[in-house]
């Protein structure tokens, strides 16, 4: 009811070691999903042609990316200010695009709360590699209370201002 589109990452065999090149379309991994917004620092790349062949495994600005296998609970949105217009998600991720009823930033912030993490991880399997069972199906069935869009904008603005202040403080501390 809140999503326009949701899709899994490619099968592992679709991105082999020999597919990586020096520049091109960045491939996301867990280190890129360490906060609310995508961490644009470090990537491996595939060619434009390879990315095109992966179809729905391409994520774009305003999409939200979720880890469904491995380090569970990671969820980040791709901001309009990201370094790249598109990315390829990994085999351990899925991505979704929100419809007009919900801001991707709002939903991402929600899933970073204790309640949101509980909801997200409620169908996790800890046998072997941690994974979300039927990740996209389960995710679509989650019930999330969403305020109206005006209220979402207000909430996101508060959190974004706080997040930006934290980033500045971290940079200051790192330079001491």
Predicted regions and their residues:
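Non-catalytic DNA-recognition/assembly elements of restriction-modification systems
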Residues: 1-11, 145-175
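Extracellular/periplasmic catalytic domains that process cell-envelope and extracellular macromolecules
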Residues: 20-21, 87
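A short glycine-rich beta-alpha junction/loop motif
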Residues: 86-94, 125-156
């Amino acid at each position: 009811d809140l999503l326009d589109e949701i899709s899994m990452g490619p099968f592992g065999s679709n991105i082999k070691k020999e597919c990586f090149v020096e520049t091109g379309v960045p491939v996301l991994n867990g280190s890129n999903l360490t906060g609310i917004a995508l961490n644009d620092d470090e990537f491996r790349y595939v060619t434009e042609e390879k990315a095109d062949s992966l179809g729905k495994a391409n994520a774009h600005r305003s999409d939200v990316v979720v880890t469904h296998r491995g380090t569970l609970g990671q969820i980040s949105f791709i901001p309009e200010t990201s370094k790249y217009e598109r990315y390829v998600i990994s085999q351990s991720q899925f991505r979704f695009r929100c419809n007009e009823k919900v801001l991707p930033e709002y939903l991402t912030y929600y899933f970073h709360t204790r309640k949101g993490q509980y909801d997200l991880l409620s169908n996790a399997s800890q046998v072997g590699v941690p994974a979300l069972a039927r990740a996209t199906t389960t995710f679509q069935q989650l019930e999330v209370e969403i305020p109206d869009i005006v209220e979402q904008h207000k909430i996101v603005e508060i959190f974004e201002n706080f997040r930006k202040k934290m980033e500045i403080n971290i940079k200051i501390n790192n330079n001491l």
